[in-house]
Regions:
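C-terminal output helix
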Residues: 106-119, 123
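Charged docking surfaces used in two-component/phosphorelay signaling
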Residues: 15-23
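Receiver (REC) domain active-site loop signature in two-component systems and cognate sites
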Residues: 57
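Acidic catalytic/metal-coordinating carboxylates
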Residues: 33-36, 61-65
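Alpha4 helix (beta4-alpha4-beta5 surface) of REC/receiver domains from two-component response regulators
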Residues: 64, 84-102, 109, 113
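Acidic, metal-coordinating helix/loop segments flanking the phosphotransfer/catalytic sites
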Residues: 30-50
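Active-site T/S-Asp motif of two-component receiver
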Residues: 53-54
């Protein structure tokens, strides 16, 4: 069963995404911001198949989290989420480390498909 770490400062979004992804039988761990997510990744020695993170968050944003995760845990696939066009542009330079950027708002089906695609690409590596 794939392990997925979700980082989003909006509780309602964390809950929605966690519930949607759990429908596919994944083990879910959540974090309120990038710093907490990085702490979880470090404490668990990167034992996740996928990091699904919002870009715009306080303390440590998703871009900084993605850079740290890719550096320290290169086997973890990274999927970003954002509702802001300027944040999506910031992420465009991270193609080497980020699987994709999912644009908010999205449907439950959209996020499940994005996660399935990211996990499938990891399996092909």
């Amino acid at each position: 069963m794939p392990r997925i770490l979700i980082a989003d400062d909006e509780e309602s979004m964390r809950v929605l995404v966690a519930r949607a992804i759990a429908l596919d039988g994944h083990e879910i761990v959540t974090a309120e911001d990038g710093a907490e997510a990085l702490e979880i990744l470090t404490d668990q020695d990167g034992a996740f198949d996928l990091l699904l993170t919002d870009i715009k968050m306080p303390i440590m944003d998703g871009i900084a989290l993605a850079l740290a995760a890719a550096r320290d845990f290169p086997d973890v696939t990274i999927l970003l989420m954002t509702g802001f066009a300027d944040q999506r542009e910031r992420a465009s330079g991270l193609n080497a480390i980020v699987h994709d950027v999912v644009t908010k708002p999205f449907s439950v089906a959209d996020i499940r498909t994005a996660v399935a695609d990211a996990l499938a690409s990891k399996a092909r590596e």
